[in-house]
C-alpha cells in the first residue's frame, strides 16, 4: 500500500534543513524502490522549503511510520509534524491506467 508522509517543518528550521539536506536525500535514496516520490513543500515564493511530501510503499502504516521516524530531518527535530495517510495514486501513475 502507498502512504503519503506529509511533513511540516518547525518554524525557523530552514538553516538546519539546508545543512542536513544531503543526509536527508541520501536516506531517501537508500529506500530504493520503497520510495515512490518525494519533494519539498515551499513558501509562496516557490523556493523557500518548509516541509516535505514523501510517498512510500509499505506493508503497513507502522512500517511507513518507521520510515518517517528514521528520516534524518525527523531525528534532528526539523519536522514539527508528520501526518501519515494511506494514498491511492489515481492519475498519471506510470504503472497503471486510470
Map each language-model feature to its residues.
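Conserved, structured core segments of small domains
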Residues: 1-98
Amino acid at each position: 500500500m502507498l502512504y503519503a508522509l506529509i511533513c511540516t517543518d518547525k518554524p525557523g528550521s530552514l538553516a538546519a534543513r539546508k545543512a542536513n539536506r544531503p543526509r536527508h536525500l541520501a536516506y531517501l535514496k537508500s529506500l530504493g524502490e520503497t520510495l515512490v516520490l518525494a519533494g519539498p513543500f515551499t513558501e509562496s515564493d516557490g523556493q523557500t522549503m518548509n516541509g516535505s511530501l514523501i510517498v512510500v510503499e509499505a506493508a503497513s502504516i507502522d512500517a511507513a511510520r518507521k520510515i518517517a521516524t528514521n528520516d534524518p530531518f525527523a531525528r534532528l527535530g526539523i519536522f514539527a509534524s508528520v501526518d501519515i495517510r494511506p494514498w491511492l495514486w489515481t492519475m498519471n501513475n506510470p504503472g497503471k491506467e486510470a
